[in-house]
């Protein structure tokens, strides 16, 4: 308010957080610029400030699910967008985690906007076989990164050599099949039984048992017994 034709002191440009002042206008539609005159006009006038949105920073924070089920915040990622506009940052992909759906947020003028993405752990199917194309020892879904213990296996006559491929300490990021590998054991005892024919009564009588050793799965040839000069009588008496 001032007297007609008095000097006008141009005011400082107004300030609005997140915006840049772009001049005065005569109309609300901001189509006709207005220049503040040097002298007070003879009537009141309403003028309108034009504002242009500025780039303002915002953050994306990723929360990865821990093996204990608790989500842990990662280091924030900084972005920028125009004040009061909507932004939809694309969530990053992390191996072993489900990628969340995109979220839309409005960029606040004060720079406090935070877009939060939560990443649950994926589950993968693991199968343990006794041998190639053999019996299934275990088959189940396991959460990525959790502690992994292979099942105990036993195979008579064989020594366990490990799993193929090697079983990691934690669940891998993918379905896997692990096969037990074996080595045939040495020194496995077996018996050779020798029977002699009963000439009078017919049939055979066990004469001797020899205990020998070999390797599991190998074919063995038992040594022949030396009974060529012996004739067995009914009551077990020997005659030459």
Q: Which residue ranges define each predicted feature?
A:
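Secondary-structure capping and domain/repeat boundary segments
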Residues: 1-228, 233-240
């Amino acid at each position: 308010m001032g007297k007609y034709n008095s000097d006008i002191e141009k005011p400082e440009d107004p300030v609005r957080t997140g915006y840049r002042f772009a001049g005065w206008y005569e109309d609300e539609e901001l189509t006709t610029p207005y220049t503040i005159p040097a002298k007070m006009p003879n009537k009141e006038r309403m003028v309108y400030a034009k504002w242009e949105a500025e780039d303002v920073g915002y953050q994306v924070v990723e929360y990865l699910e821990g093996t204990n089920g608790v989500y842990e915040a990662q280091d924030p990622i900084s972005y920028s967008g125009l004040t009061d506009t909507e932004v939809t940052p694309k969530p990053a992909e992390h191996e072993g985690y489900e990628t969340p759906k995109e979220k839309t947020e409005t960029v606040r003028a004060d720079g406090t906007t935070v877009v939060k993405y939560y990443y649950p752990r994926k589950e993968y199917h693991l199968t343990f076989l006794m041998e190639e194309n053999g019996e299934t020892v275990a088959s189940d879904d396991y959460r990525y990164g959790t502690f992994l213990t292979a099942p105990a296996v036993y195979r008579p006559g064989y020594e366990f050599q490990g799993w193929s491929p090697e079983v990691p300490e934690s669940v891998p990021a993918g379905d896997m099949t692990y096969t037990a590998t074996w080595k045939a054991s040495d020194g496995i005892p077996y018996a050779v039984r020798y029977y002699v024919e009963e000439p009078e009564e017919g049939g055979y009588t066990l004469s001797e048992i020899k205990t020998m050793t070999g390797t599991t799965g190998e074919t063995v040839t038992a040594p022949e017994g030396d009974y060529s000069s012996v004739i067995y009588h009914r009551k077990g008496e020997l005659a030459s």
